């Protein structure tokens, strides 16, 4: 899902897509761990606040609900304000380096898989 967010066809603001191309392995936060409902989101000031609130050890959803409200995330996706709310992003966001079409991205994925199979996994290829 994360990789498809950064495609030309994805209906989210270009700012989000461009920010994803700048990401690295440290660009996500795990939230709601203390509430046993872990979510990985893109690291920004809002997700940092949620993680900080949770670090007290006694946080409840009531303590963070205004920060994580869906309407705030909608503003991120529709208006491109990257610090307005949280937005889901998997660790694979670190591998996003461009914003291709879906067709280009899937073709590249297939080509890369074939290279791995033909190159490194030749002995297991049927």
PLM feature spans:
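Conserved active-site-proximal phosphate/metal-binding subdomains
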Residues: 2-126
């Amino acid at each position: 899902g994360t990789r498809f967010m950064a495609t030309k066809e994805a209906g989210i603001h270009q700012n989000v897509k461009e920010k994803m191309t700048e990401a690295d392995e440290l660009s996500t936060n795990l939230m709601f761990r203390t509430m046993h409902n872990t979510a990985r989101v893109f690291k920004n000031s809002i997700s940092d606040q949620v993680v900080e609130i949770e670090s007290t050890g006694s946080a409840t959803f009531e303590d963070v609900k205004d920060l994580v409200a869906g309407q705030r995330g909608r503003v991120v996706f529709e208006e491109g304000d990257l610090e307005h709310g949280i937005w889901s992003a998997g660790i694979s966001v670190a591998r996003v380096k461009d914003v291709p079409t879906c067709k280009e991205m899937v073709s590249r994925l297939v080509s890369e898989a074939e290279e791995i199979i033909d190159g490194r996994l030749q002995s297991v290829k049927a």
